[in-house]
């Protein structure tokens, strides 16, 4: 694997900075999004956090992409695979579906084809602005890509099978998805906690 590929398949930069938002930062980001006056920006931030989709994939979503009955959103993978069009369905909580339906008037004849009309760079800046208002410090994690990585880690921590996370994120190779195991390490923390366990009183020498 080349150096660039290794860096792309890591949750840290060569300088040791993490590329993903933490669970606390994710919750603060969503809370800041809920306070936005611009409701369409709120739903945009929400869809990024709850699907882990790429920002360009979110901008391609239409009213037909949202399936309220099944509570899923159908996302077209923008990374081509042999010229085939790949659509992946990602489940959403019912309250997110309701929010999308209400804000974008999905049941109305006046519903625009595209859910959002931002440019990619404009959407990137808007998301960064919401992160700043959420008190998330600048860095490689405070980006739309950081939200994508944060989704993967949140899914791993929630016990979602790796193959399902691969499907939801649109990874062609499972090896790409396994990077999220780097940030969990539940078993490692368990072993470490045993090392950190303080000695009992009958072992500690008082020196008297």
Protein language model regions, located:
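A short, glycine-centered helix-capping/turn motif at helix boundaries
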Residues: 47-60, 158-160, 171
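C-terminal secondary-structure termini that scaffold catalytic or DNA-interacting sites
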Residues: 1-13, 17-20, 196-208
């Amino acid at each position: 694997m080349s150096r660039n590929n290794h860096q792309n398949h890591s949750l840290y930069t060569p300088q040791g900075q993490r590329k993903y938002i933490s669970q606390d930062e994710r919750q603060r980001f969503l809370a800041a999004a809920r306070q936005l006056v611009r409701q369409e920006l709120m739903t945009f931030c929400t869809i990024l956090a709850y699907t882990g989709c790429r920002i360009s994939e979110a901008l391609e979503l239409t009213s037909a992409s949202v399936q309220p009955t099944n509570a899923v959103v159908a996302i077209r993978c923008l990374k081509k695979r042999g010229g085939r069009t790949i659509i992946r369905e990602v489940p959403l909580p019912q309250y997110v579906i309701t929010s999308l339906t209400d804000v974008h008037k999905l049941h109305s004849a006046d519903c625009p084809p595209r859910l959002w009309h931002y440019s990619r760079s404009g959407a990137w800046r808007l998301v960064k602005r919401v992160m700043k208002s959420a008190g998330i410090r600048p860095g490689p994690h405070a980006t739309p890509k950081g939200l994508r990585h944060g989704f993967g880690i949140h899914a791993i921590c929630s016990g979602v099978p790796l193959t399902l996370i691969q499907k939801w994120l649109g990874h062609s190779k499972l090896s790409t998805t396994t990077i999220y195991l780097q940030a969990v390490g539940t078993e490692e923390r368990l072993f470490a906690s045993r090392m950190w366990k303080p000695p009992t009183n009958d072992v500690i020498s008082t020196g008297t």
